[in-house]
Amino acid sequence: MADDHPQDQAEHERIFKCFDANGDGKISASELGDALKTLGSVTPDEVKHMMAEIDTDGDGFISFQEFTNFARANRGLVKDVAKIF
């Protein structure tokens, strides 16, 4: 998207790679759960809810595009996450 700064794109890529533990180019529910545990305690229901919100095509994985779309819509949250990762 035209309003993304190159540094935002680089930050999204960096965070995505941290979440994508096995490096397959997509974030599974398990990987999301593990990453969210780093941020604090998280329940399986919270992970399911987050997956449902971010995984817009419903394939069970978060693609980089889906992650970027979520990051654009939640800039403040992503900035906070970037400080931790």
Curated annotation (Swiss-Prot):
InterPro entries (UniProt xref): EF-hand-dom_pair (IPR011992), EF_Hand_1_Ca_BS (IPR018247), EF_hand_dom (IPR002048), EF_hand_pair_protein_CML-like (IPR039647)
Annotated keywords: Allergen, Calcium, Metal-binding, Repeat
Name listed for the protein in its UniProt record: Polcalcin Aln g 4
Residues at which Ca(2+) 2 binds: D55, D57, D59, E66
TM spans (from-to): none
Pfam families, A to Z: EF-hand_7 (PF13499)
Organism name: Alnus glutinosa
Gene3D superfamilies: EF-hand (1.10.238.10)
Protein origin, superkingdom: Eukaryota
Ranges for domain EF-hand: 7-42, 45-77
Molecular function via GO: calcium ion binding
PROSITE patterns the UniProt entry points to: EF_HAND_1 (PS00018), EF_HAND_2 (PS50222)
